[in-house]
């Protein structure tokens, strides 16, 4: 498999990601770009010409999740689109997706299926302090779940954002159920 990644531009501060990441067909997205159309066009170009043995990977949330980031993201969504905020209101673990980048990738490769993936077990490992706290506890098993969705079952245009939100709400519920199960063992 030959992946093409969409990564946030801030990751270029890591010398390894800067050197290796720029030698491969990846795109480092400027999430604060004044003109997002340039960034979205680059994502369409990145996905153009994907073959059956290649994959484009995007993290629709845009960054690692935390309660503070989730609250801030939901606040922004509520200001712009109250109906969407209502759809996403029950999420407890994942950040809401930002659909424009995913839609741009799919526009670039209209025949590609979609894989929705989520995981548990890395919670709290996003800071050095979190790693130290995690070392003092019984380790949780890492679990990764992925689901392939035939492209014919993925809506286009305005329906895509609603569909992606639904996928994220389902994934958030699955994460919650798994964490509840692990907490009761």
Summary of predicted features, one role per range:
Residues 1, 51-52:
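Short helix-terminating capping/connector loops at secondary-structure junctions
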Residues 8, 29-31, 117, 147-149, ...:
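Conserved beta-strand termini and adjacent loop/short-helix elements that scaffold enzyme active sites
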Residues 105, 181-184:
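Exposed, interaction-prone extracellular/peripheral surfaces
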């Amino acid at each position: 498999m030959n992946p093409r990644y969409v990564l946030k531009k801030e990751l270029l501060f890591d010398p390894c990601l800067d050197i290796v990441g720029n030698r491969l067909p990846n795109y480092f997205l400027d999430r604060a770009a004044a003109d997002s159309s340039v960034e979205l066009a680059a994502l369409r170009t990145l996905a153009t010409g994907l073959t059956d043995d290649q994959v484009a990977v995007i993290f629709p949330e845009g960054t690692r999740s935390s309660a503070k980031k989730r609250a801030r993201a939901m606040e922004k969504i509520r200001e712009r689109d109250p109906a969407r905020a209502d759809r996403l209101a029950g999420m407890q673990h994942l950040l809401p997706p930002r659909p424009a980048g995913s839609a741009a990738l799919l526009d670039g490769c209209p025949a590609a299926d979609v894989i929705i993936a989520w995981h548990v077990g890395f919670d709290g490992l996003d800071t050095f302090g979190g790693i130290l706290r995690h070392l003092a506890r019984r380790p949780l098993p890492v679990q990764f779940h992925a689901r392939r969705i035939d492209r014919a079952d993925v809506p286009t245009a305005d329906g895509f954002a609603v569909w992606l939100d639904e996928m994220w709400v389902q994934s958030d519920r699955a994460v919650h159920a798994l964490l509840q199960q692990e907490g009761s063992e």
